[in-house]
Amino acid sequence: MKESFYIEGMTCTACSSGIERSLGRKSFVKKIEVSLLNKSANIEFNENETNLDEIFKLIEKLGYSPKKTLAEEKKEFFSPNVKLALAVIFTLFVVYLSMGAMLSPSLLPESLLTINHHSNFLNACLQLIGALIVMHLGRDFYIQGFKALWHRQPNMSSLIAIGTSAALISSLWQLYLVYTNHYTDQWSYGHYYFESVCVILMFVMVGKRIENVSKDKALDAMQALMKNAPKTALKMHNNQQIEVLVDSIVVGDILKVLPGSAIAVDGEIIEGEGELDESMLSGEALPVYKKVGDKVFSGTLNSNTSFLMKATQDNKNSTLSQIIEMIHNAQSSKAEISRLADKVSSVFVPSVIAIAVLAFVVWLIIAPKPDFWWNFRTALEVFVSVLVISCPCALGLATPMSILVANQKASSLGLFFKDAKSLEKARLVNTIVFDKTGTLTNGKPVVKSIHSNIELLELLSLASSIEKSSEHVIAKGIVEYAKERNAPLKDISEVKVKTGFGISAKVDYQGAKEIIKVGNSEFFNPINTLEIKENGILVFVGRAINEKEDELLGAFVLEDLPKKGVKEHIAQIKNLGINTFLLSGDNRENVKKCALELGIDGYISNAKPQDKLNKIKELKEKGRIVMMVGDGLNDAPSLAMSDVAVVMAKGSDVSVQAADIVSFNNDIKSVYSAIKLSQATIKNIKENLFWAFCYNSVFIPLACGVLYKANIMLSPAIAGLAMSLSSVSVVLNSQRLRNFKIKDH
């Protein structure tokens, strides 16, 4: 059984990887992925051995709060920005008290100058009050940090909590010594760390705020889509409008769409017309004109007219619901490249605590001065600096932040990745197999020429009258051509369809009811009276004389034209060093012509679904990484067999289950865009990981005091600043993907 739910209380990758590690050890858990950014988890488990309630209990034992739905954040007295501003103000106040006299004695009133026990004690008490206020503003670090420590799942908050608490306790001890007149020398008053506590917390809060703002911006793609989802719709019942919940709509319901409202579910216009904003599907800002018979998709916005539509999907299976599910899965899933960071994060925090304790002991023993309190202060500063400067967040954010921003960018291009692995793998593709009809071509064959043995208008009338009963795209091309030439429609009866061959019906022809047949050459008894040398899709029209003989009346030559810009986009793809193949069920002449015209390397014609499947198997056996690009309708086996499946779609014409990548702008440029975005994303992730590993590898030893003899020691305050800048740098570097652009050449 697969389930998705939310987890509250996670602060860094040590939290998410700790949950994964703990639950992953359970025999009944087959797979679990926890997303720190989305605060969510996807789990697959054996329902015969456990249930979701038991899994929730296991997570609660680790100190986190699992929930089936994401509860609204509790409204606090102070907003995050106000809390941050107050933290900055009180930090500056404490720094002013502790360091003002060093800059200039005139900055502080005489009563606060540390020239005697009384003023020293008063100054320290004011620092303590300021520090306690800042600690209260940053209390989440202590609540989450110590809770995680209690459950033996230490995280970034644990490091902050331990480090600042140690500094506070030491300062309180020094304050007690001053209060009890322990120091007899007026120049040997207590050494406090109240300003370090404040500065550390303030810098961490600034860093976290920048992170959260960046996360929120990156999550805007899903939020915007969810805002497009209407909660109610106007249903027509007995010529009356009734407002109903969208979840209650079933296929076949007639809905009224008012100007300015969003389409509730996928459907088809049955009365009226309108201009729809489909930018959430295609990324194109221009409105799309829709008339009777045209499909409309959930989440798109109607502009200035009202119309009636018939629902063709319920809410659960609508285009918008599928897109939201894809984005959620993409943001929640993990790329393979993140596994290394997860493994490091799982031991990172305990290792840092061990290093900090070891450094404290070593400095206490080998410190160069014989004064115990000097040695203790130095060891304590090193201990706090090591804890505070280490940055598991930089490691944890390196991959998911890039994935998050990349998915947001993809949605603006009309692209949707099924999961992070799809985004990661697209860059490795070295062979692309294209379906032809509807993928490289418009999928709407148009009549190129007509060969007729009877009056042309009569041939058009016969063919269109019969083809009107068919939903085949070729039939629609003939019907449209006849309609443009005002060919009259005839009454027909006894319609019979022979799948894969053609359609027949009784029609009034030359004053009698005759069986007229429309289809390919195999639908007729041998025809030798008309030779057609043109390349194209051949559709014959004939009269059945008897069961063994047909009379040829004429033939249509249709052509499915390539989409605009396809040739240029395939050239772009080939410039990446990727081999291209065309697989089509069309005849050899048409497929060969299409491949040569578009510059495709190889082709297979007359290909049945099994032939396409075999070709992809063959390519994979040769070590090729294969991307299959199709429309998702009749090539599902081939899509499933490929390494990366791309479905070119228009709304509900596609089932996202078959796709790794869905392009709703129905443009081959999307394939090139997906590959380039994948390359840019992985490059960005590698930059983030490189920085995160280098930062921790360099700054943790530095905080330990390895350069003490060079007079380089990091204070806890500087360590806090460095840690904040580390995670912020990863976030800002990930944001560069927002500026990703596809070059035309």
UniProtKB/Swiss-Prot annotation:
Tell me the superkingdom of the source. Answer: Bacteria
- Source organism per entry reads Helicobacter pylori (strain J99 / ATCC 700824) (Campylobacter pylori J99)
- Stretches assigned to the Cytoplasmic side: 1-83, 145-151, 216-343, 398-685, 736-745
Q: Where does Mg(2+) bind?
A: D631, D635
Keyword Ion transport included in the entry's annotation: yes
Q: List all topological domains (Extracellular).
A: 105-124, 173-194, 367-379, 706-716
Under the heading SUPFAM superfamilies, the entry gives:
Calcium ATPase, transduction domain A, Calcium ATPase, transmembrane domain M, HAD-like, HMA, heavy metal-associated domain
Q: Which UniProt keywords apply?
A: ATP-binding, Cell membrane, Copper, Copper transport, Ion transport, Magnesium, Membrane, Metal-binding, Nucleotide-binding, Phosphoprotein, Translocase, Transmembrane, Transmembrane helix, Transport
Q: Which InterPro entries match?
A: ATPase_P-typ_cyto_dom_N, ATPase_P-typ_P_site, ATPase_P-typ_TM_dom_sf, ATPase_P-typ_transduc_dom_A_sf, HAD-like_sf, HAD_sf, Heavy-metal-associated_CS, HMA_dom
Residues given in the record as Cu cation binding sites = C12, C15
One Gene Ontology term of the molecular function aspect: ATP binding
Which EC number(s) are documented for this chain?
7.2.2.9
- Record-level GO cellular component terms: plasma membrane
Similarity comment text for this entry: Belongs to the cation transport ATPase (P-type) (TC 3.A.3) family. Type IB subfamily.
What's its job?
Answer: Probably involved in copper export.
Q: Which residues cross the membrane?
A: 84-104, 125-144, 152-172, 195-215, 344-366, 380-397, 686-705, 717-735
Protein name as catalogued: Copper-transporting ATPase
